[in-house]
Amino acid sequence: MLLSSTAIYAVGASGMYQWSVALSGYVSTETGKAPTAYLWMPEGCQQVKAVVFAQQNMTEEMIFKMPVFQKRMKELGVGLIWVAPCFTQNWNPTTGCQQTFEEMMVGLAGQSGHKELEHVPVIPLGHSAQATFPWNFAAWNPDRTLCVISFHGDAPRTNLCGYGTANVEWGRVRNIDGIPGLMIEGEYEWWEARVRPALAFQMMYPNSCISFLCDAGSGHFECMPETAEYIAMFIRKSLEQRLQVDGSLKKLTPQDGWLACRYNPDLQPNDGDGAKDDIFTINQRPQAAPYIDYQGDRHDAFWYFDQEMAELTEARYAETRGKLVRPLEKPTYTISADGKRVSVNVPADVHVEVISGPLRKVNNHTFEVYPYESGLDNPKRSFTSWLIAIRDGDSKYKRAVQPIEVKFPNPLKK
């Protein structure tokens, strides 16, 4: 299959990505044409150590465009690949997604001159409806997966896939043993039924290395800078502990890491079953400890690389525990007559950020439309943008967040 580039440098209206290829072996149901894979390489990087691979959905865009995340990826020598529209939600190999991926990597290697892309380790990352595919990608690509990031997402082999239908069956022999995986769930989207499959997975696969972070003070839609930093640290630890001199990946042994107690919410009720969840106070929580020394219930604990990662997780939980919730009213917005600007009405103590879509921030109240990478031929995504209003927390209150869906007139419907 021949993959064609849309440009040589600064492809797409955002100017973020340097190279792109059309995935001409796949036709998107959203646009009726091939998706495009965009590649960002850190400035001055001669050879990347790994790439983060995500597909168009929602918060993946926000994470990739965050200056702090790009800064950390540059420090680590890690590239970014974003595909729009997506070519798979569940990574079911019977659909041809594996071949599409492999041809994409060869095409991007050829376009960019970074031949290492043909075999470089991959970090699959997905949010919400895309949060299941990273686990399944790893199960079918265990020797190439550096680590897994399921953001505001799903447990491996979950029965509650973010895309709303059945998961892909792994069979008896497939697993992700020794591959570090990170599941993140927002505090305000908390649902016990999403967490339980992750705990059960560890019992079923005792050689798995599953980390968990409750994104305290956050909901479903947004990524805060401290969470982007956490993800970057997870990637750094993966590189440090797994990447060998010859480019191969060392399998980790969970017994060499740390264990820390799962998150217990202080917001009730949270899972709709009418039953209160067990709540640990800070003093009652079992102390995080090396795997062999952990004194808590191992069935209620998650794995972490080391003391630094386990204690950072505990610190995130302690930061908001016991604080009050101060709801944030949903902001209103207006679109200019020419359809090129959006004005958002928020109080002075609230800031607004872009999650996804064809908007970029001018100031805290003004956002301008630009023809971003998705183009203007996708009825599902080209005319919708998501913003997030944020009131930062303090010593008394948790952070408050409120998503804003902005819909533009769709000329395709005329």
Language-model features, listed with the residues they occupy:
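A domain-start/cap signature at the N-terminus of enzymes
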Residues: 8-51, 122-137, 141, 149, ...
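Active-site machinery of serine-nucleophile hydrolases
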Residues: 49-51, 55-105
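Alpha/beta-hydrolase active-site loop
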Residues: 91-117, 124, 136
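The feature captures the conserved acid-bearing segment of alpha/beta-hydrolase catalytic domains
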Residues: 146-232
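Alpha/beta-hydrolase-fold serine-hydrolase catalytic core, especially in secreted/extracellular enzymes
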Residues: 208, 216-338
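Low-complexity "stalk/linker" and mucin-like segments enriched in Ser/Thr/Pro/Ala/Gly
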Residues: 330-345, 351-376
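Short, exposed coil/turn segments at beta-strand boundaries within extracellular/luminal domains
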Residues: 393-401
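Extracellular interdomain linker/stem segments of modular secreted and single-pass surface proteins
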Residues: 407-413
